[in-house]
Amino acid sequence: MQKRNPWPAWVLGCLALFAAGAAWALPPPPQSWQPDVDRLVADDSAHPPPQNGVLFVGSSSIRMWTDLAADFPGVPVINRGFGGSAIADSTYYADRIVIPCHPRLVVMYAGDNDIAEGDTPAQVSDAFKAFVARVRRALPDVAIAYISIKPSLARAALWPQMREANRMIADWSRQQKDVTFVDVAARMLDANGKPRAELFRADGLHMDAAGYAIWVQALKPVLARHGFAVH
């Protein structure tokens, strides 16, 4: 995975404070995912995505979820995973890959790379707040769900920081309207609190079908709560 320089703390702070109402331009991301985003937009032109659906956005764990539609049969799902992105990257590109789809529910998975590349739990939490503010500025009624940062074999040493970021985001989400924290971490750990090896591909970072099955079961009640028929 190509490294990026972490978004500076002052940028995340400004996003969190002002995204909801100020008229300003986001700074360019430290690493450009422009080619990935251009491909998503081009695909939208050729195959317009459903409106009022469930839009999944975030990093490679979303991008590599190739069975997304099959995992939620009958649900209008849109996959907007790109690169090895950070939360702030989804905020930067929201105007192009999130807002035009007018989803009823946005499901985000990101934050894993943020911690791996040096961000603190507080920076990750602030980045998610900024994402919510940016999307809600355009779509005030959209529901947003955050999939907890997953424990993994490859990043086991970073789990304490990831767990703290999860705690901060969960605490904040409980105080918001229609923002849901979806805890997948507990089901991805064994009895000794270690990542379950059978849930991961050979790289120890990305999930196999068994890992995604845990996510599906955790997300079904969220989708049902927002009016989607799940089986």
Annotate each PLM feature.
Residues 153-231:
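Catalytic His-Asp segment of secreted/periplasmic serine-dependent ester chemistry enzymes
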Residues 94, 128-133, 166, 170:
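Generic structural signal for well-ordered alpha-helices
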Residues 62-78, 89-125, 129, 145, ...:
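Oxyanion-hole/transition-state-stabilizing segment in secreted/luminal serine hydrolases
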Residues 57-58, 81, 111, 184-185, ...:
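A secondary-structure boundary/capping signal
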Residues 25-102:
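Serine-esterase "nucleophile elbow" of acetyl-processing enzymes
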Residues 139-143:
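A short helix->loop->beta-strand "cap" motif at the edges of active sites that frequently abuts
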Residues 2-14:
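Bacterial N-terminal signal peptides that target proteins for export
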